[in-house]
Each structure stands twice: as structure tokens, then as C-alpha cells.
Curated annotation (Swiss-Prot):
TM stretches of this protein: none
Membrane topology, record value: Peripheral membrane protein
Domain of life assignment: Eukaryota
Organism: Tamias striatus
Protein name: Regulator of G-protein signaling 9
Domain G protein gamma stretches: 219-280
Domain DEP: 30-105
Length: 484
């Protein structure tokens, strides 16, 4: 049997169908496969039929799996249309009894190139309409009317094809005609499933490109591949022990700055009511904490990422008459992550301020980088200054950063840095125990308490004698008053 391997290159999630097809081919082996024979269905003898129990037993013996796994796999095969039931076509499960099944012809397998188009489905429905004399199921009637409106321009062709196929089918013998009808019905139950059934072939939109297609390599592509492998050979390999040592060193270096592992100083504001931690670690606080200043010495990225560290580094660069380097880097960051509707204006402004001949804050970059940058500014975009920005970044990292750490500015900042002490709590002797926040009472509960208090006041018993005595006193006072 020759099976075309088509239709899967655009459907990466359907690649497992190849394994199912290989298993179905083994099932159809005349020597080691599932035993088939002619079976009588209604008044017709159908050739090459088999029972669900035989299929289940063959799967168990062939794959050495449990009966439950074999049942699930059998249901899987039936749902994808490789085996179809003869007696209950809509029930796409493998019954482990004497229910009759039949192998689907490879022409109707899901991996074939031809798709289930509307025209083919319309011809099938028109043929069933002729055969059943207009008695179709409800969902088939709806699809028939919908397709009649959708492809009305070629409906005459659909009816003509349906009549020709119906006429050709009547010329076949009864068994072949019944088998072909079952095959078509099983195919369309999978590809145009009725309402309420699971569409197992729903894989989404087709891909525009074929990821498995073998493309013809050009000379340029081969040269790039050779260059890549040459660079890979020249690249120095690192032992796993060295890599793991680097990870351990990094973890030890940053462990003191991990708020979860080492805690927060003076206290965690999310657990306590103290907001001093936020005040001490504000972006541009006047005097930062010692831990924050020490972190600037870890690497250059930690320094330039911190707004306070960047401010201190800018002050140092101005003293060295190279403050334009950090200014250019910040302008490039604003170009990349700022308002993109003003990219062109920002790029022109950066060029005039930092790159143009005789610019007020001219930066020193090599000629090759300058040529790439100027050429890219003809069509500006957010990454047009990446080459120049990388050059300046590496210049500051390798030259200015080391001098900054040795400068009096950094040493003075480190000496003045605050080292907050942990807030002690009398209620707890263990450092990891934290006082939980007390939530304020819910407004709903407060309203309920007020209503209950009013109800209690209204329910208090009233002394009638006291009320009557008060009314009598008021009436006597009115009588004793002299007339005006």
C-alpha cells in the first residue's frame, strides 16, 4: 500500500497521524493484522468487516498495553476516521463487543493533500438529498441551504456532479455501493462533524510557510553557515565546573540583597506598618543605604540601572569632562522606549547635539560606527543608534567605571551611606516571625451592627404609666398658666 505523506507540513500539531497510519497499516496486514471477513448488515453483505473486540485484542497484543489504554487508543483511531462503524455511524467510539467496523480507504485519510472543500461537501449533500428524496437531518438541511447561498454561482455544477455520482453508484453492485456510502459518510462525519460532536481536526489556521520544506541553499547562505561553524570552533569552551562556579558566585554576591532570603532593613513594609524602607530606598534619595551603594560595585549594569547611582556617575563624568557619554546613552534609551511618534524628531535632535561635526556635546566614536549611524539616520527608527550606543556603553564600562569606583566621589558616598538597623519587636523573640496586619472592619459589618443596635433600642419595653404621668403633668401646667 502506498500512502502519500502530504498535508502535515502546515499542521505541526497533526504530526502524530503518521504513527497512527503506521499502526493502521499493520492492522491491515493479511498475515499478522486484524482478521476480516464478510459480514451481513441489514440486507447487504459487507466485505472486509471486523468486530470491535477483535481490534481491541489486536492492539493489546501488538503494543503490550492494558485494556484501558487499548480502548483509549481505539477510540482515538475511530475519531480520526481511520476505522468507521457500520451499524452506528455517528457513535465514533470503539465498542469492545461484536459491533462491526471497517477500515477507511487511504484516499479519505486526514493526511491527504486535498482539503475538505465546500464544493465537495455540497455535492455530497446534494447526492444524499437525491437519494433520500429530500429527507435530510436538520444540520444537513442547514448546511445544504447555507452552501446553496454561498456557492450559488456554481450550484448547477454541484447538482450535475451529484446526479452523475448517483447514477454511477447505481451501476455498482449492492455491496460496493453500500461500502462507498459508508466511507463517504464516515469521512464527512469527521471533517464536517454534526453539532455536539468534538471536531478533532480543528488545528487552527494553516501556516503560510512550510517549516519542513527543504529549501535550495544559495552561495550566501552556505558562506554564512561556514562562517558560523568556524566561529563556533574558535570559541573557547567552558567546563561545567567553571559555569557552576560562576552561578554559585553570583548567588552568593546577590544573596544579601535578596529581600526574601535575607530580609529587609529596617523592616518589611508589607508586613509591618513602618514605611521607612520605602523612604530610605527612594529613587533619588539624598543619602542612600550602604547596601545600595555597595551594589553599584557589583557590575556596571547595576550602577547605571539605579537612578541614584546614575546621578552619582554623571557627577563624576562631568568632573572628567566626559559627561556627554552618559547623556548620549540616556538619549538613546529615550529614543528606544519613549514616544514612538516622535522618533524622527528625537533622532535628528540627538544627531545635532552629539554626532554632527562641531556639535555642542560631541562624542568620540570610531569612523566605522559613525558611518553606520549616519547611514541609518536617513531612515530613522527606534534602534537606529544601537551601534553608537553600544560603543559608548562599552567605553564607559571598560574605562570610566573602574576609575569611578576608585574616585573620592564613590568613597565619600559609601562612607556617608546609611546602614539601617533592624526594627526589634518585643512581642517576638524569633527574627522570622512577623506581626500580621490587622484588617479594618468591613463597612458591611459596621452597617449590620448599627442596624442591630437600632433594632435593640426599638425593641425595649416602654412603661405606659410613666408616659401617662408625663402627659398629665403637661396638661396641668397648661391649665395653671394665666391667660394673656
Amino acid at each position: 500500500m502506498t500512502i502519500r505523506h502530504q498535508g502535515q507540513q502546515y499542521r505541526p500539531r497533526m504530526a502524530f497521524l503518521q504513527k497512527i497510519e503506521a499502526l493502521v497499516k499493520d492492522m491491515q496486514n493479511p498475515d499478522t493484522g486484524v482478521k476480516t471477513q464478510s459480514q451481513r448488515v441489514l440486507v447487504t453483505s459487507v466485505p472486509h468487516a471486523m468486530t470491535g473486540g477483535d481490534v481491541l485484542q489486536w492492539i493489546i497484543q501488538r503494543l503490550w498495553i492494558s485494556s484501558l489504554e487499548a480502548q483509549n487508543l481505539g477510540n482515538f483511531i475511530v475519531k480520526y476516521g481511520y476505522i468507521y462503524p457500520l451499524q452506528d455511524p455517528k457513535n465514533l467510539i470503539l465498542k469492545p463487543d461484536s459491533s462491526l467496523y471497517r477500515f477507511q480507504t487511504p484516499y479519505f485519510w486526514p493526511t491527504q493533500q486535498w482539503p475538505a472543500e465546500d464544493t465537495d461537501y455540497a455535492i455530497y449533500l446534494a447526492k444524499r438529498n437525491i437519494k433520500k428524496k429530500g429527507i435530510l437531518e436538520e444540520y444537513e438541511k442547514e448546511n445544504y441551504n447555507f452552501l446553496n447561498k454561498k456557492i450559488n454561482y456554481k450550484w448547477d455544477f454541484v447538482i450535475m456532479q451529484a446526479k452523475e455520482q448517483y447514477r454511477a453508484g447505481k451501476e455498482r453492485n449492492k455491496a460496493d455501493r453500500y461500502a462507498l456510502d459508508c466511507q463517504e459518510k464516515a469521512y464527512w462525519l469527521v471533517h464536517r462533524c454534526p453539532p455536539g460532536m468534538n471536531d478533532v481536526l480543528d488545528y487552527g489556521l494553516d501556516r503560510v510557510t512550510n517549516p519542513n520544506e527543504v529549501k535550495k541553499q544559495t552561495i550566501t547562505a552556505v558562506k554564512k553557515e561556514i562562517m558560523y561553524y568556524q566561529q563556533a570552533l574558535m570559541r573557547s569552551t567552558v567546563k561545567s565546573s567553571v559555569s557552576l562556579g560562576g552561578i554559585v558566585k553570583y548567588s552568593e554576591q546577590f544573596s544579601s540583597n535578596d529581600a526574601i532570603m535575607s530580609g529587609c532593613l529596617p523592616s518589611n513594609p508589607w508586613i509591618t506598618d513602618d514605611t521607612q524602607f520605602w523612604d530610605l530606598n527612594a529613587k533619588l534619595v539624598e543619602i542612600p543605604t550602604k547596601m545600595r551603594v555597595e551594589r553599584w560595585a557589583f557590575n556596571f549594569s547595576e550602577l547605571i540601572r539605579d537612578p541614584k547611582g546614575r546621578q552619582s556617575f554623571q557627577y563624576f563624568l562631568r568632573k572628567e569632562f566626559s559627561g556627554e557619554n552618559l547623556g548620549f546613552w540616556e538619549a538613546c534609551e529615550d529614543l528606544k522606549y519613549g514616544d514612538q511618534s516622535k522618533v524622527k524628531e528625537k533622532a535628528e535632535e540627538i544627531y545635532k547635539l552629539f554626532l554632527a561635526p562641531g556639535a555642542r556635546r560631541w562624542i568620540n566614536i570610531d569612523g566605522k560606527t559613525m558611518d553606520i549611524t549616519v547611514k541609518g539616520l536617513k531612515h530613522p527608527h527606534r534602534y537606529v543608534l544601537d551601534a553608537a550606543q553600544t560603543h559608548i556603553y562599552m567605553l564607559m564600562k571598560k574605562d570610566s567605571y573602574a576609575r569611578y569606583l576608585k574616585s573620592p566621589i564613590y568613597k565619600e558616598m559609601l562612607a556617608k551611606a546609611i546602614e539601617p538597623q533592624e526594627t526589634t519587636k518585643k512581642s517576638s523573640t524569633l527574627p522570622f516571625i512577623r506581626r500580621h496586619l490587622r484588617s479594618s472592619p468591613s463597612p458591611v459589618i459596621l452597617r449590620q451592627l448599627e442596624e442591630e443596635a437600632k433594632a435593640r433600642e426599638a425593641a425595649n419595653t416602654v412603661d405606659i404609666t410613666q408616659v401617662m404621668s408625663k402627659l398629665d403633668r403637661r396638661s396641668l401646667l397648661k391649665k395653671e398658666l394665666p391667660p394673656k
